[in-house]
Amino acid sequence: MFLNVDTSIRIRAAPETVWDYAYKPENWTASNPHEHFGLYFDSPDNLPHAGVTFTQLESVAGIRAVLHGRIHYMDRPRLAFWTGTAAYRLLGGLLTVRLGEGGVLSLIERHDGIDMAHNVYIDFPDSLRGRLCLWFFEKFLNGRQAVYDHAFRELRYFKERLEEQRTKPPNE
């Protein structure tokens, strides 16, 4: 049972500029400082590449998680596809719920910039436990909105930073 969330934003910048800024782990972590606590790629340069695994420390809907994932495909500056397993710690870590997650990060060039989208999903098991987790996540944690807000904050941060750089005079 999938919870899918699609987010997108128009950014007035070249696709390469957006890609090169967003793919740096320090910028991704900064894009949502209240919910991102670190992103580490298992590569010599600590950057994402096709086939590279990663660990992201984060919080979604107020629940801390450790996401272990893999970048399956990258086509700079257009598309990246990732999947992983997030371990959500409930009740102070007494209960851990592991859920499959994934996403597609895409940049589509438009006449006035690019549309940057991050379409993410959480895969709740098709079992009684999975249905209970999904029900609780949506009913009590407003999970769908929390996931949307989480992803949209990332995109909005990139838009604000990159468009701010475009408007600064060259000597600043």
Where are these regions (language model features)?
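Beta-strand/loop substructures that line and gate deep hydrophobic ligand-binding cavities in soluble
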Residues: 89-149, 153
